[in-house]
């Protein structure tokens, strides 16, 4: 729950607090969400510390976040799992480490060459001045989004003692949803003799009162304590507990988890916890560059950051079930992160599914997005359905109430909520009757954005398909047939003759590529409405398809969403003109239209597998790593709410999931060998591992095409594997070559499964299609061996 870091006043997206630019640090707070986009999230109750005040007058120190910011010393930031530190221009070095519900801060004061009883301070206008060394630490009852409405604060101390306690509470707004939440804080500070203490509101500070029971809305307010100078080499230490239940619970959390104020010991314990969490994966990185290793481990680490375990901290209802928050959003995470967790942390993934079902029991709907105990804005379909089915098909069934799970996903499919902009699905009456979402639909049953008719439709169809899998498994045969049929609804908005054109006022229609056939919106009467197939891509009006717009796709183009038919890729390929045209079309998308900063782009990297060209999936995986995912400051192409990290981690390990299905698409790992602890009970007790080994491994990655494979010593020609490999363990050996040779993964029986609606006899075997060419470095091409 606690993730301590320095907060900045960056004008860039600072939803997670810290931004690596030249912005000023304004505080050190304890609650954060990562990679959310939108408004800043959490960042409640930041601490701030001055090394001293001008003229030794505490009223001349800057208290508000708007004026107290100080620049960081370039290159001083250090981050590792469980630890963050930074040096500021005001003679402060801040270090922080965490436990589950508390943070421990250590503030030291290098003299910066001034020496003696002085330290440097920075004035609000940026001037560096010498001040008497007498640290003043404050607790600000504010958040990153400056959303507080009401609240209170109190400080407890005895003059002449060396310990004080500051507490506070406030009501805040979520960053990407509706409603509000209350949070509570308890900060114990010590390290030197206390000189004075009091409270502040805005720029005004005083020693009295010690208690404010009603802070006006917005702006900085809180408590403060000023110390004598710590002894040589000494520090001011702050232990901060947080809670969503009460101040008493916040104090109890801190006292239970950090009883001794031992910073180094707390840091070691945090490191040990992270080592244990990451130890389920081992790699042989011989020859692999340090930056590539950093990119992999950083991605794996980030995949474990959210959702956050708030069990025991839910003020909304009493329950013995786990409670997880910060699902930011499942529209992002269902594609990569949750499937990865089924492999590396199935206990947490099981708890998350249970938490989703408990939300359904108490709120009435599964969330698509949820943060700070509030309903978040839905971005597409009811994607928790996919997460739940994914858990079932991968046998994460223990302790999950599958009767309630089925009830919940059927509720999404059948029952429209009053406000489907924050849960469930919308336009269901028309969707059920027509099999699509009309652009001119008048929804009398609920309210939500009148947009995203293409992107919502393809997601609704896939979610219905996933529900059909669960229905069949649980014995609901009629439901299974109904939802399987709805899984084919994507065909209702497939416009075969739609060209890749742009309509210009003066130039008329411009044909941009030779490809035809795209998802297009329809009206109630069945007529088509033109939608620029490149709208919301890097080529056209990139940022025009967000929640507050009326376009038919969300954060992506029709070019992109026209590939999203993972339930029946075989038929989609036929609609696109057969395997050869499909492959050319997918290559064109990667070359000309793709943007990897949104999660819908993940699966198309590997969809060449369905066209019998797993070599091209490998090629593009090696293009995006390291061009888009790397160890540089810009080494993540989009906001990472754990999904970007999960994508990178799985690409490095040599597989990618088709979420909601028991399918992982195989590409060569970026390591000689990857070893993952098997998750099945017997396999885990026996210490078995799922091992992916590369024969002819080349750390320059010139050899990146799978020539042949064996699974547990037997020839293996499929280009995909099932979850049993990770559950029971085994050895998958991949022989790689510099050029795509042989027929591995190209035959009709080697392709990932498709689940047609009705019978089809016209599916072309991709193995009968001659390979053309694959791009190589420098824009050249490598010839493929025909077979």
Regions found by a protein language model. Give the residues of each.
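Accessory carbohydrate-recognition regions in carbohydrate-active enzymes
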Residues: 1-338, 342-350, 354-386, 392-443, ...
């Amino acid at each position: 729950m606690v993730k301590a870091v320095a907060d900045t006043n960056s004008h860039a997206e600072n939803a997670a607090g810290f931004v690596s630019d030249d912005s000023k640090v304004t505080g050190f707070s304890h609650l954060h969400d990562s990679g959310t986009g939108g408004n800043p999230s959490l960042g409640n109750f930041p601490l701030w510390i001055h090394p001293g005040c001008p003229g030794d007058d505490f009223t001349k120190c800057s208290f508000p976040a708007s004026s107290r910011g100080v620049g960081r010393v370039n290159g001083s930031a250090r981050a590792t799992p469980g630890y963050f530190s930074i040096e500021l221009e005001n003679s402060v070095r801040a270090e922080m480490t965490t436990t589950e519900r508390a943070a421990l801060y250590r503030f030291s004061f290098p003299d910066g060459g001034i020496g003696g009883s002085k330290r440097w301070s920075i004035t609000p206008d940026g001037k560096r001045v010498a001040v008497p060394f007498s640290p003043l630490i404050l607790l600000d009852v504010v958040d990153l989004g400056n959303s507080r409405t009401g609240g209170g604060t109190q400080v407890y101390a005895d003059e002449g003692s060396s310990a004080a306690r500051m507490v506070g509470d406030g009501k805040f707004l979520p960053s990407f949803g509706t409603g509000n939440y209350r949070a509570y804080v308890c900060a114990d500070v010590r390290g030197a003799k206390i000189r004075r203490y009091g409270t502040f509101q805005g720029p005004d500070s005083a020693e009295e009162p010690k208690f404010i029971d009603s802070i006006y809305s917005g702006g900085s307010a809180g408590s403060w304590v000023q110390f004598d100078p710590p002894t040589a080499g000494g520090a001011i230490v702050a232990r901060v507990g947080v809670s969503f239940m009460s101040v008493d619970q916040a104090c109890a959390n801190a006292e239970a988890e950090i009883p001794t104020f031992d910073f180094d010991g707390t840091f070691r314990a945090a490191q040990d916890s992270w080592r244990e969490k990451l130890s389920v994966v081992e790699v042989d990185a011989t020859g692999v560059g340090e930056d590539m290793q950093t990119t992999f481990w950083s991605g794996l680490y980030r995949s474990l950051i959210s959702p956050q375990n708030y069990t025991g901290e839910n003020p909304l209802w009493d329950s013995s079930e786990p409670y997880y928050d910060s699902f930011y959003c499942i529209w992002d995470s269902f594609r990569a992160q949750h499937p990865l967790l089924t492999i590396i942390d199935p206990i947490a993934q099981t708890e998350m599914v249970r938490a989703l079902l408990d939300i359904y029991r108490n709120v009435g709907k599964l969330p698509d997005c949820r943060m700070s105990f509030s309903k978040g804005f839905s971005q597409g379909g009811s994607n928790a359905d996919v997460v739940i089915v994914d858990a079932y098909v991968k046998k994460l069934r223990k302790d999950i109430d599958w009767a309630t799970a089925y009830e919940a996903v059927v509720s999404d499919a059948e029952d429209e909520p009053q406000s489907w902009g924050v849960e469930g699905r919308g336009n269901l009456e028309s969707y059920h009757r027509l099999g699509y979402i009309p652009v001119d639909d008048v929804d009398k049953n609920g309210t939500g954005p009148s947009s995203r008719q293409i992107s919502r439709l393809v997601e609704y169809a896939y979610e219905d398909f996933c529900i059909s899998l669960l229905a069949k498994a649980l014995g609901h045969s009629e439901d299974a047939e109904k939802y399987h049929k709805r899984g084919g609804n994507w065909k209702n908005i497939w416009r075969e003759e739609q060209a890749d054109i742009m309509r210009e006022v003066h130039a008329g229609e411009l044909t941009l590529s030779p490809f035809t056939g795209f998802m297009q919106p329809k009206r109630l009467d069945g007529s088509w409405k033109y939608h620029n197939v490149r709208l919301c891509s890097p080529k056209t009006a990139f940022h025009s398809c967000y929640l507050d717009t009326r376009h038919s796709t969300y954060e992506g183009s029709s070019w992109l969403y026209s590939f999203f038919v993972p339930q029946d890729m075989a038929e989609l390929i036929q609609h696109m003109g057969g395997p050869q045209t499909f492959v050319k079309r997918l290559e064109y998308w990667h070359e000309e239209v793709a943007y990897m900063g949104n999660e819908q782009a993940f699966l198309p990297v590997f969809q060449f597998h369905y066209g019998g060209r797993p070599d091209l999936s490998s090629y593009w995986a090696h293009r995006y790593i390291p061009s888009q995912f790397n160890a540089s400051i810009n080494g993540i192409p989009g906001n990472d709410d754990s999904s970007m990290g999960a994508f990178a981690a799985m690409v490095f390990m040599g597989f990618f999931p088709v979420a909601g299905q028991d399918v992982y698409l195989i590409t060569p790992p970026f390591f000689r060998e990857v070893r993952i602890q098997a998750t099945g009970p017997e396999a885990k007790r026996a210490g078995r591992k799922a091992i992916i080994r590369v024969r002819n491994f080349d750390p320059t990655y010139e050899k990146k095409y799978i020539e042949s494979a064996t699974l547990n010593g037997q020839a293996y020609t499929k280009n995909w594997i099932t979850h049993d490999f990770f559950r029971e363990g085994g050895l998958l050996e991949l022989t790689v070559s510099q050029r795509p040779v042989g027929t591995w993964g190209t035959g009709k029986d080697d392709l990932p499964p498709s689940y047609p609606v009705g019978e089809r006899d016209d599916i072309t075997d991709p193995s009968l299609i001659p390979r053309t060419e694959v791009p190589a470095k420098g824009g050249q091409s490598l010839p493929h061996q025909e077979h």
